[in-house]
Amino acid sequence: MKMSKLSDLEGHEDRVWNVAWNPSGTILASCGGDKSIRLWGLEGGSWVCKSVLLDGHQRTVRGVSWSNCGRYLASSSFDGTTCIWRRQDDTFESCATLEGHENEVKACGWSPSGRFLATCSRDKTVWIWEVGEDEEFECASVQTCHSQDVKKVLWHPDRDELASASYDNTIRFFCEEVDDWQCYCTLDKHASTVWGLSFGPGPEPQLASCAADGSVYVWGTKGDRRSWELCGTLERHPRPVYDVSWCRTRGFLATACGDNAVRVFVKDGGDCSWRLGCTLTQAHSQDVNSVSWSPSGGLLASAGDDGYVRLWQID
C-alpha cells in the first residue's frame, strides 16, 4: 500500500499532543503545549482552522475526545482540569470544568452511551464521571488500581466498559457493578510504559496497545468477553510508540513513533497475523505523538513535537 500527504495544518505554537475526529469526520480537533485547541475543517476543498479555543486551560492541553453525538468535546490539561465544550453550529462554548485530580490530566474519553466521561492523571487515578441533566457532571467512581501515572483511557466501542493504560506497564479494564465500578481484568505482558490503546472493528473487537519499548500488542477475548489474552504482536519499532489507531472500516493499524515515523500495518491472513503495509519515514521532523483514522477510513491524521498536524491519504 502507498500513502501520501494531503495537507499540512499549521497554527500550533508548540508541540501537538493529540488529534481526534468528530463522529461524522467533518471536524478534526487538535491540542498542544500552546494551551490551545484547534478545530479544522474543509473550506473550498482545503483543510483550514475553523476555530481556536484558548480560554479553557492554563497549561498544556494533553488530550481531546468527542462524544458519540458529536455535540460535546472534552479536553484534558496539565492544569489538572478537564473542560467540556458544547458545539453550537460552528462555535464552541465551555459549559463545564471538571476538577479533582491532584496532577496533570493526561487523557479523557466519552463512553459510547454518553452517560459517562473518564479521565486519567499523573496522580495514578482514573475518574469516572456521570453525565447528568443540564450538563452537570458528578464523579461516580475514583479507581486507584494503577501504581503509576495513567497515560490513557478508552471506552469499549459498544458497551460502557473502560480500558486504561499506565506507566506501571499494565492495562486495566473496568465495568460498573451494582454499587461501584470495579477492575475486572489486568493485562501485564508489556515490559514498559503503555502509552496508547485502540479498539478494532467487529462485534467483539480486539484491542491494540503500544509501549515505550517499541512493542505493539493485539489482545482479544475468547468465549468470556471479559477474559482478555494476548493474541498478536506487531513488528517491533526502534523507538517508543506513543499512539496507535485502528481503522474501523478497513482494519488497518497506524502507529505514532518516537523515530518521527508513522507506520501502517495490515492483516496478513489470520486474525492475529500482521505485516507492515507502509512507512512514512519522516512524517514529522520530531516525535510523532498521535495518530487518528477518520471515521470513513479515508484519511489519517498525525501530530508531532514539531508543532504540525498532518493529513495523509491512501493512494
UniProtKB/Swiss-Prot annotation:
Any Pfam family from its record, for instance, is: WD40
Top-level taxonomy: Eukaryota, Metazoa, Ecdysozoa, Arthropoda, Chelicerata
Purpose of the protein? Essential component of the cytosolic iron-sulfur (Fe/S) protein assembly machinery. Required for the maturation of extramitochondrial Fe/S proteins.
Q: What is this protein called?
A: Probable cytosolic iron-sulfur protein assembly protein CIAO1 homolog
Matching entries from InterPro entries are given as:
CIAO1/Cia1, G-protein_beta_WD-40_rep, WD40/YVTN_repeat-like_dom_sf, WD40_repeat_CS, WD40_repeat_dom_sf, WD40_rpt
The answer to whether the entry has keyword Repeat is yes
**GO CC annotation, single:** cytosolic [4Fe-4S] assembly targeting complex
| Natural source organism | Ixodes scapularis
User: SMART domains from the xrefs?
Assistant: WD40 (SM00320)
Task: Print the keywords alphabetically.
Answer: Repeat, WD repeat
BP GO annotations: iron-sulfur cluster assembly; protein maturation
